[in-house]
Swiss-Prot record:
Part of the 30S ribosomal subunit. Forms a tight heterodimer with protein bS6. The lineage of its organism: Bacteria, Pseudomonadati, Pseudomonadota, Gammaproteobacteria, Oceanospirillales. SUPFAM superfamilies: Ribosomal protein S18 (SSF46911). One of its GO terms (cellular component) is cytosolic small ribosomal subunit. Pfam families: Ribosomal_S18. This is Small ribosomal subunit protein bS18. NCBIfam families: S18. Belongs to the bacterial ribosomal protein bS18 family. Transmembrane segments: none annotated. It comes from Chromohalobacter salexigens (strain ATCC BAA-138 / DSM 3043 / CIP 106854 / NCIMB 13768 / 1H11). InterPro entries: Ribosomal_bS18, Ribosomal_bS18_CS, Ribosomal_bS18_sf.
Amino acid sequence: MARFFRRRKFCRFTAEGVKYIDYKDIDTLKSYITETGKIVPSRITGTKARYQRQLSTAIKRARYLALLPYTDSHQ
């Protein structure tokens, strides 16, 4: 019986040495929201708490300025 190998999660922002997450960096922010528009929790992404707070604030600012959608495209 094979054991399940879980990959270790790491914080991408710590590894890259990011000081501040910018709300205008849409490509980065899109990778942290689901296709329905929800913010992905840090227990799934592995983001540290400090950067998760910055990330959620940046996503909310980008949504307010219509850079990111609140929800997916309704058909």
